[in-house]
Curated annotation (Swiss-Prot):
Annotated Gene Ontology cellular component terms: cytosol; membrane
Organism expressing this protein natively: Staphylococcus aureus (strain MRSA252)
UniProt cross-references to InterPro entries, sorted A to Z: T_IF-3_C_sf (IPR036788), T_IF-3_N_sf (IPR036787), Translation_initiation_fac3_CS (IPR019813), Translation_initiation_fac_3 (IPR001288), Translation_initiation_fac_3_C (IPR019815), Translation_initiation_fac_3_N (IPR019814)
Single GO MF annotation: translation initiation factor activity
Keyword Cytoplasm: yes
Descriptive protein name: Translation initiation factor IF-3
Family named by the database record: Belongs to the IF-3 family.
Subunit (UniProt): Monomer.
Any one biological process term the GO annotation gives: ribosome disassembly
Primary location: cytoplasm
Subcellular compartments: Cytoplasm
Gene3D superfamilies according to UniProt: Translation initiation factor 3 (IF-3), C-terminal domain, Translation initiation factor 3 (IF-3), N-terminal domain
Keyword field contains Cytoplasm: yes
Top-level taxon: Bacteria
Length: 175
């Protein structure tokens, strides 16, 4: 039989309560039993006695195979982690005076990020006196967003941040 686990689950001899509300391995409620009786019942069917609700009065214990129970829990946790999607933010840097071919190359890269499910931050850095012509940078960003509107939505409109202007694009939700 098992002893106490790292997660401090009370099993078998490590149970501190004198009386337990007992549930059988089939899920049937047996009723309130003493710890000794419950342990004997678990040993008869060669299973463990595990406290599943320690804060209840009296604590709820279940007769089960603890190793199998832990394995099932770990399997569920792995499935939950698989279902979680980590969204990264990728950055594309442009200049206000970008040429058409360079723009198309950066657009292709941004579209690749968006189709993979990542968010895309498109930024323009103004150097020197170029900051006096913010409207040029804004037009470039709006053109970029317009080219991606079939696969992305604008999460944040063009915004200045120091000497940079940026726009945030998020992939559209797949149906």
């Amino acid at each position: 039989m098992s002893t106490i686990a790292k997660d401090q689950t009370q099993i078998n001899d490590k149970i501190r309560a004198k009386e337990l509300r007992l549930i059988s391995q089939d899920g049937e409620q047996i009723g309130v039993k003493s710890k000794r009786e419950a342990l004997e019942m678990a040993e008869r069917v060669d299973l463990d006695l595990v406290v599943v609700a320690p804060n209840a009065k009296p604590p709820v214990a279940r007769i089960m195979d603890y190793g199998k129970f832990k394995f099932e829990q770990q399997k569920k946790e792995k499935e939950m982690k698989k279902k979680q999607k980590i969204i990264n933010v990728k950055e594309i840097r442009l200049s206000p005076t970008i040429e058409e071919h360079d723009f198309q190359t950066k657009l292709k890269n941004g579209r690749k990020f968006l189709t993979k499910g990542d968010k895309c931050k498109v930024s323009i850095r103004f150097r020197g006196r170029a900051i006096t012509h913010k409207e040029i940078g804004q037009r470039v960003l709006e053109k970029y967003a317009d080219e991606c509107k079939d696969i992305a939505t604008v999460e944040q409109k063009p915004k200045m941040d120091g000497r940079q202007m940026f726009i945030m694009l998020a992939p559209t939700a797949e149906k």
